[in-house]
Swiss-Prot record:
Domain of life: Bacteria
The protein's name in its UniProt record: RecBCD enzyme subunit RecB
Domain UvrD-like helicase ATP-binding, first and last residues per copy: 1-323
Ranges for region Nuclease activity, interacts with RecD and RecA: 765-1083
Region described as DNA-binding and helicase activity, interacts with RecC: 1-704
Source taxonomy: Bacteria, Bacillati, Actinomycetota, Actinomycetes, Mycobacteriales
Cofactor(s) needed for function: Mg(2+)
Record organism: Mycolicibacterium smegmatis (strain ATCC 700084 / mc(2)155) (Mycobacterium smegmatis)
Subunit structure: Heterotrimer of RecB, RecC and RecD. All subunits contribute to DNA-binding. Interacts with RecA.
Reaction equation(s) it catalyzes: Exonucleolytic cleavage (in the presence of ATP) in either 5'- to 3'- or 3'- to 5'-direction to yield 5'-phosphooligonucleotides; Couples ATP hydrolysis with the unwinding of duplex DNA by translocating in the 3'-5' direction; ATP + H2O = ADP + phosphate + H(+)
Annotated residues for binding of Mg(2+): 830, 962, 975
Phenotype reported upon loss of the gene: Unlike E.coli, triple recB-recC-recD deletion is no more sensitive to DNA damaging agents (UV light sensitivity, mitomycin C, methyl methanesulphonate or ionizing radiation) than wild-type; has reduced resistance to H(2)O(2) which is exacerbated by further adnA-adnB deletion. Triple mutants have no effect on homologous recombination or on NHEJ of blunt-end, 5'- or 3'-overhang DSBs or on incompatible 3'-chromosomal overhangs. However the triple mutant disrupts all single-strand annealing repair of DSB.
Length: 1083
């Protein structure tokens, strides 16, 4: 195969070029170099190039590398003496001025470059296609469909097997696993094709197909898409030869480069081939020897098929990562090896680094193989648990010796962070982690651990359960034993009821913090109480604190996104702990950024490099007998779901063995200077990747067997085979004898660092608040704890307001007299009134539809039909003097603005210093502007005195106005209220909502303050949006609609005021003055 020359001729227009890389050969550098050349030489501008890779981190790295290469080229063009590599020296030879101009233009417009993951690229294209693609702009892209799949399995399992008396052919856990695997492998044929109709295979196949069909229906119905749907939809849009999508994509991107192409899948290649093959310059860069993501959909057969049809195929021939001595040793073992087939072969590469950069190590051979021996003549295998203990201790001793030896790498002392331990399984990784920590060697490992299964998640659950019922001693003691409090069984017993009561009081206090400032405030309070210092003093404390902080963030984000209170968060956390999801945020985070040995799986290590790499268990691989088998049939990716089938099992094992051979290649090639591996006679040693490479084949043989033969072998015979590789230039064979372990001295702390001291005074007057927040801040009552709703309920209504004013008008029964009270009911009514169309031909049906939709968030024990019927009369109730002759039914959506969300600064918002007002100043404005006979004039006294009056108006005010109605040229504010104003046990009637009684309710609930703030919001909004705005002309006052008193056209009217409709028109000058006051201007 021809070796690729970055300085050679650029790929010809409208051709496909495959660049086959090897580990460490700099494919990202080659790709960035090609981009720089295309731009510098005027072949294309940066926005005419599409760069695709297969992961977010990879796409970000690629973007940074491309930009850095363009910057470096510009530096060289400005000063040729600063050219740092062959590419830059090539670019400065000719046409410097034009090349400089082109690269500067590219840098200036770099944000226009399309450097994206496959899914991001599909999203961009589908959005731009409009009707040319099967894409709805209103759909939501979700990271995981696991919850939806679980829901479908629940329903279909009941439908398929619920009526059976005998045990079903498919258990529920099997059904759930089957569904998730099938959904996770799109563009895969399900097998067997035609099973016997009554066979178990037919049952499983039908269930799988039904899941896929139902998933499509529910995704459409709910307006959601998974990432794989993006690919499928784009592939469908590109299928016709004359597809407008093809034309647009070819015109936009005449040059396309795909990185990590070995990880492609059939649909991804279908998209790329249909859009660009033969029409754009297509460069595919990948290394089939590193195709290790079959379990994520990566399909090596697709890569090989694409590579076979490419017009030009070249290889990257220089290893920029590893020392020559290591490259030579690895090539002695890997040269010519077929890693899954004759088209996936290890080719020789040349090493860029000719020397050996690791100096002074106790054992400085670049490739070492440590062999665990048995007694002479013994062929019995060693149990893997015993090997994990032995190899873990041997690993720790070897690393300890290296770190204490004074060895250097690139003239710098070897540190723990220069060492990686790479395994295939998390169980092996955990064993290594424990062994290193036991030996006093700093090590970090994140693993596949789900943070929801961690001790931190469990402690958060105990805490949330105690928040809900702080009066139950058992729950309080369980919370006390968590990391948040740190109590033990002994301390709880000794502290007795007094300690339990103190913890309960703290729980109530923390619950108050959560309500005011979110869940993160609980974590902060616990930190201030000493949790961090206590937990970090424990062994593994960094891991625990990292998980606690991670869980806090997830809970905070969920509470903010979903509107959950503490009780809803408790239920959500229980669900998350019982179901494993696919979201990346579930993965535990690195617990320390200190210099430490990095322990990781092979998949995580891909793309990384380390001076020294340890492979303690590459010799061993457990091969399960899966009931769901991925395999290829004549190049077609298939998933066998029909149960046991010997032929399919053999095909699956063969492909799995090829994957494992490639895993071993990836692991071996992470090292820059030294690889240390082990071999031991375990039960699963015949399946191990390293064993099959070295025991399963002799030097010079290409085929790597799927399993070593014979499966059991004596130490003498094993050593004979392994030493043949040593003689051929491979690893140095060492006996695995555990040496002494010396503690690794900690890294010296920098002497020129000191904790910064905080001297500034915190402005306690600044806050982000709301009308309700201003009232809560003035409350002196202690914080109580109760079960909270799943979504934040309205907190500006009172279930039962004590009123003493006599009822007025006729006793027309309230349509809502027998409906529930409470915040959830009020929130449901508000949500329905915000979204229902009053112009609907059948208003009752319209209301019922919206009641059903909103009841998912606001579950209330009320029949839909009953509530819908009760809400119709309010739409026919006269709205009084502010909207003369009108009802809500007569004001359509074009003349109403629902849910006017707002947030505006008070006293300059974030500006430091300066004057600011208090609520008592608002009271003075009311005295100045409200006439004495105004029904709410007495509210000035309430604002001017007491704790409420001293509340500062500084920071940001946020909230939402229920609705604004356009009535002629005026704009009227509307706020819906579901308050119960009845007295005694009598039937609720319109008379309970006369004007005098509503005035009482307004004053009792501080609604005048809410009305004034909303008036300022409307004043500012109209000043921004309405041309020729005049407050006196356009401000139309405030309507507080007490919906329980609105009884329809027959609603009693007293002195021009209908029952249930409170009208108030504060003077426009008052609103303008208040707006200025909130800005800290002189009114």
């Amino acid at each position: 195969m021809k070796v690729f020359d970055l300085l050679g001729p650029l790929p010809a227009p409208n051709t496909t070029t495959v660049l086959e890389a090897s580990a460490g050969t700099g494919k990202t550098f080659a790709l960035a170099g090609l981009v720089t050349r295309f731009v510098a030489e005027g072949v294309a501008t940066l926005d005419q190039m599409l760069l695709i890779t297969f992961g977010r981190a990879a796409s970000q790295e690629l973007r940074e590398r491309v930009r850095a290469q363009i910057v470096a080229a510009l530096v060289a063009l400005d000063d040729p003496s600063r050219a740092c590599n062959d590419l830059e020296e090539y670019l400065v030879k000719t046409d410097q001025q034009a090349r400089r101009r082109r690269l500067r233009d590219a840098l200036a417009g770099f944000d226009a470059a399309t450097i994206a993951t496959t899914h991001q690229f599909c999203q961009i294209v589908l959005k731009s296609l409009g009707v040319a693609g099967d894409s709805d702009a209103g759909v939501t892209l979700v990271e995981s469909l696991d919850d939806l799949v679980s829901e479908i399995v629940d329903d279909l399992y009941l439908a398929h097997f619920g009526g059976q008396k005998d045990d079903p052919e498919l258990s529920y856990p099997e059904a759930l696993k089957l569904a998730r695997v099938v959904v996770g492998n799109p563009a895969t044929q399900l097998r067997p094709r035609d099973p016997d109709p009554d066979s178990p295979a037919a049952v499983r196949l039908k269930f799988a197909r039904d899941v896929l069909a139902e998933l499509e229906i529910r995704k459409r119905r709910r307006g959601v898409l998974g990432y794989d749907d993006l690919l499928t939809r784009l592939a469908d849009a590109l299928e016709p030869e004359d597809s407008p999508a093809r034309v647009r994509m070819q015109q936009r991107w005449p040059i396309v480069m795909v990185d990590e192409f070995q990880d492609t899948d059939p649909v991804q290649w279908q998209v790329i081939e249909r859009a660009f093959s033969g029409r754009s310059t297509l460069v595919l860069i990948g290394d089939p020897k590193q195709a290790i993501y079959a379990f994520r959909g990566g399909d090596i057969a697709t890569y090989l098929r694409a590579a076979a049809t490419a017009g030009d195929k070249q290889t990257l021939g220089t290893n920029w990562r590893s020392d020559r001595a290591l490259v030579d040793r690895l090539q002695a073992v890997l040269r010519g090896a077929q890693l899954g087939g004759p088209d996936i072969v290890v080719h020789d590469v040349q090493a860029r680094h000719q020397g050996h950069r690791l100096v002074g190590a106790p054992r400085n051979d670049p490739f070492r193989l440590r062999v665990v021996s048995r007694k002479p003549g013994n062929t019995r295998v060693i149990p893997i648990d015993q090997l994990r203990r032995h190899i873990g201790r041997d690993l720790a001793a070897d690393i300890s010796a290296l770190l204490n030896s004074g060895a250097t790498w690139c003239d710098q002392p070897v540190q723990a962070k220069d060492i990686a331990v790479i395994t295939e399984t998390h169980k092996d990784a955990r064993a290594c982690h424990a062994a290193l920590l036991a030996a006093g060697i700093p090590a970090v490992y994140t693993g596949d651990s789900d943070v929801f299964t961690s001790e931190a998640a469990e402690d958060w659950l105990y805490l949330l359960e105690a928040f809900d019922q702080p009066h139950r001693p058992g729950l309080v003691r369980a919370a006390a034993a968590t990391m948040f409090f740190g109590e033990t069984a002994e301390s709880l017993a000794a502290g007795g009821d007094a300690l339990t009561d103190r913890v309960a009081d703290t729980l109530r206090e923390w619950a108050g913090h959560a309500r005011e400032r979110g869940v993160a405030a609980i974590f902060e309070a616990a930190q201030l109480a000493g949790m961090g210092k206590r937990v970090l003093s424990w062994q593994g404390g960094e891991r625990l604190m990292t998980d606690l902080a991670h869980m806090t963030q997830l809970l905070q984000d969920t509470a903010h996104r979903e509107g959950f209170g503490l009780a809803a968060l408790r239920d959500w956390l229980r669900t998350q702990r019982s179901e494993r999801g696919g979201e990346s945020e579930r993965n535990r985070r690195l617990d320390s950024d200190a210099a430490a040995v990095q322990i990781m799986t092979v998949w995580v290590s891909k793309g990384l490099q380390f001076p020294v790499v340890y492979l303690p268990f590459a010799f061993n691989r457990y091969v399960p007998e899966p009931d769901l088998v991925l395999f290829h049939d004549d190049g077609q990716r298939c998933l066998h779901v029909g149960g046991a089938d010997p032929a399919v099992a053999r095909a699956g094992r063969a492909e799995a063995a090829g994957d494992d051979s490639r895993l071993t290649y990836v692991a071996l090639t992470r090292a820059q200077s030294q690889v240390v591996a082990w071999w031991a006679p375990s039960y699963d040693e015949p399946n191990g990747g390293l064993s099959r490479l070295m025991r399963g084949r002799a030097p010079g043989e290409a085929i790597v067997p799927d399993k070593c033969s014979p499966p059991k072998i004596s130490d003498e015979d094993a050593l004979e085979r392994l030493r043949a590789w040593e003689a051929a230039g491979g690893p140095v064979i060492e006996e695995s004898v555990i040496g002494a372990v010396s503690p690794v001295p900690p890294e010296p702390a920098p002497e020129d660092l000191a904790a910064r001291k905080f001297f500034r005074a915190i402005d306690m007057a600044w806050k982000r608040t709301s009308y309700s927040g201003l009232l809560r801040a003035a409350e002196t009552a202690g914080v109580g704890v109760s079960s909270e709703p799943e979504v934040t309920e309205r907190d500006d209504e009172f279930d039962d307001i004590p009123v003493v004013a006599p009822a007025e008008g006729a006793d027309v029964p309230s349509p809502m007299a027998h409906l529930p009270t409470g915040a959830a009911f009020g929130s449901l009514v508000h949500a329905v009134l915000e979204t229902a169309d009053p112009f609907a031909e059948d208003l009752t049906a319209e209301l019922a539809t919206h009641i059903d939709a909103h009841s998912q968030h606001w579950p209330v024990e009320v029949e839909t039909a009953e509530l819908a019927a009760a809400l119709v009369p309010m739409h026919d109730t006269p709205l009084g003097p502010l909207a003369p002759g009108l009802t809500l039914r007569q004001i359509g959506l074009r003349d109403r603005l629902c849910e006017l969300d707002f947030e505006f600064p008070m006293a300059g918002g974030d500006l430091r210093g300066g004057r600011f007002a208090r609520l008592s100043d608002v009271g003075e404005l009311l005295r100045e502007y409200l006439p004495a006979d105004d029904p709410l004039a007495v509210y000035a006294e309430r604002l001017s005195t007491g704790i409420l009056g001293v509340q500062p108006l500084r920071g940001y005010l946020s909230g939402s106005v229920d609705a604004v109605l356009r009535v002629g040229e005026k704009f009227v504010i509307v706020d819906y209220k579901t308050n119960w104003l009845g007295t005694g046990d009598g039937t609720l009637t319109a008379a309970d909502y006369g004007r005098r009684r509503m005035v009482e309710a307004m004053l009792h609930s501080d609604y005048p303050l809410q009305a004034l703030l909303y008036a300022v919001v409307l004043h500012r909004y109209l000043g921004w949006r309405l041309s020729g705005y005049d407050p006196a002309t356009h401000l139309g006052g405030v309507l507080y609609l007490f919906v329980r008193g609105m009884c329809g056209a027959g609603t009693p009217v007293v002195d021009g005021h209908p029952a249930g409709v409170f009208s108030w028109e504060p003077p426009a000058d008052l609103v303008v003055a208040l707006s200025k006051l909130l800005d800290a201007e002189a009114p």
